[in-house]
């Protein structure tokens, strides 16, 4: 049914604006050191954004009404710099991604079971304490590990952890774990 006087797409944009006004957005630790990116309808990815606090991020989201919001696993001295090599990486969280549609037994229940097993491995085998588990949007779960001991790990060291986890039967998306420049969906 057509709504009189409503142009195509306007209602959707207004709903996004309302959403960002009231959404319980997750504040990434050290957000002033994180790069942000958004996907806007019909405009693709816009990266290299930086915000000093949640109020400034929320105001930007209300104005821009993006479909998706992401933040970096890495922390930088200059997260808004357009040149990656000049951002000044300070360290990077270790991110694990389990998407249910990539599993041998594809179901959200299986993804939930695997993320719980992964959390036990990270705590028990690796002794990692600063872990946050989040629903990644609609396809599965992420675990963000922020312990100081992992911040300076390089791509190969992250890959070794990913291989260890996969050898224990956990079906993670290994490239996500290895990529220190990865942008991750902002929960909320």
Enumerate the language-model features and the residues they cover.
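Eukaryotic intrinsically disordered and solvent-exposed regulatory patches
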Residues: 81-82, 128-129, 170-172
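Generic hydrophobic, aliphatic-rich segments that mediate packing or membrane embedding
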Residues: 67, 90-94, 111-114, 118, ...
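Histidine-centered divalent-metal-coordination microenvironment in nucleic-acid enzymes
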Residues: 93-96, 123, 128-154, 183-187
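Helical (often loop-to-helix) elements that flank the catalytic cores of nucleotide-handling enzymes
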Residues: 3, 9, 13, 44-50, ...
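DNA replication initiation on ssDNA origins
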Residues: 1-94, 98-109, 179-188
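Short beta-strand
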Residues: 38-39, 131-137, 174-179
């Amino acid at each position: 049914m057509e709504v009189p006087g409503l142009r195509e797409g306007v209602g959707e944009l207004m709903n996004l604006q309302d959403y960002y006004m009231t959404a319980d957005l997750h504040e990434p630790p050290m957000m002033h050191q994180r790069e942000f990116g958004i996907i806007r309808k019909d405009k693709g990815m816009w990266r290299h954004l930086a915000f000093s606090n949640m109020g400034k991020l929320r105001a930007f989201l209300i104005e821009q009404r993006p479909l998706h919001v992401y933040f970096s696993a890495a922390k930088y001295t200059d997260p808004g710099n357009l040149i990656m090599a000049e951002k000044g990486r300070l360290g990077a969280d270790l991110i694990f991604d389990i998407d249910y549609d990539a599993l041998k037994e594809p179901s959200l229940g299986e993804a939930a079971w695997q993320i719980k097993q992964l959390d036990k491995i990270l705590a028990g085998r690796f002794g990692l304490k600063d872990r946050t588990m989040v629903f990644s949007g609609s396809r599965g779960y992420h675990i963000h590990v922020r312990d100081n001991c992992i911040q300076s790990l390089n791509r190969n060291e992250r890959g070794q952890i990913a291989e260890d986890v996969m050898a224990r039967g956990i079906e993670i998306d290994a490239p996500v774990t290895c990529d220190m420049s990865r942008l991750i969906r902002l929960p909320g």
